[in-house]
């Protein structure tokens, strides 16, 4: 059973790599973005609350996010393992995830961090905005999202590094090459 996280800045290719890891390892990929969208679409109480923050481009507060993730991790398809994308973002969420896993006598096996230069990410996200017509992907918003990511995630990364389960992979390059690096890193981490 593989229980892992994938973290990285906006535009680093987390979603793409999460799909590929999921297919290759046979674990369910769980994106907090997908959880939020499903709750918003279903107009659940948590979804209605989350929508207020999402509409302003803000992170959804821990209290809401934690409950959504807890509910998702209680579903039967995660019994054979999971790959969480976009959670935890804060050290409080790290602690909450630890509690969820401890209740099932589980722990994380690997925390994979995709790394990339901010300027490359800005360039990549601006290109994606032109292709998709996403109005929320202008340079100021992109830089704000990157700043938020760095501000919140550094402590999370440090916590997992202390535990010896963090592995970093360069997220820049052709998608297949990044996937090869990711899979090699996962195998090395699992063998350690």
Curated annotation (Swiss-Prot):
Designated name of the protein: Adenylate kinase
Taxonomy of the source species: Bacteria, Bacillati, Actinomycetota, Actinomycetes, Micrococcales
Function of the molecule: Catalyzes the reversible transfer of the terminal phosphate group between ATP and AMP. Plays an important role in cellular energy homeostasis and in adenine nucleotide metabolism.
Entry-linked PANTHER family: NUCLEOTIDE KINASE
Disulfide bonds: none
Gene: adk
Reaction it catalyzes: AMP + ATP = 2 ADP
CDD domains in the cross-refs: ADK
Species of provenance: Pseudarthrobacter chlorophenolicus (strain ATCC 700700 / DSM 12829 / CIP 107037 / JCM 12360 / KCTC 9906 / NCIMB 13794 / A6)
Primary localization class, coarse: cytoplasm
Pathway: Purine metabolism; AMP biosynthesis via salvage pathway; AMP from ADP: step 1/1
Annotated ATP binding sites: 11-16, 128, 173
């Amino acid at each position: 059973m593989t229980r892992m996280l994938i973290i990285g800045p906006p535009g680093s290719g987390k979603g793409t790599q999460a799909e590929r890891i999921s297919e290759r390892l046979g674990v369910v990929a769980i994106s907090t973005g997908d959880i939020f969208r499903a709750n918003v679409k279903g107009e659940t109480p948590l979804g209605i609350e989350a929508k207020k923050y999402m509409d302003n481009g803000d992170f959804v507060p821990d209290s809401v996010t934690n409950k959504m993730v807890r509910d998702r991790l209680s579903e039967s398809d995660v019994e054979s393992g999971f790959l969480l994308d976009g959670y935890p973002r804060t050290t409080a969420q790290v602690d909450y995830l630890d509690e969820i896993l401890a209740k099932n006598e589980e722990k994380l096996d690997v925390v994979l961090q995709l790394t990339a230069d901010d300027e490359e990410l800005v360039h990549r996200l601006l290109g994606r905005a032109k292709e998709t017509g996403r109005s929320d992907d202008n340079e100021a918003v992109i830089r704000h999202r990157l700043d938020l990511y760095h501000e919140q995630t550094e402590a999370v990364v440090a916590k997992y590094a202390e535990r010896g389960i963090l592995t970093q992979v360069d997220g820049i390059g052709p998608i297949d090459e990044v996937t090869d690096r990711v899979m090699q890193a996962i195998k090395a981490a699992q063998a350690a």
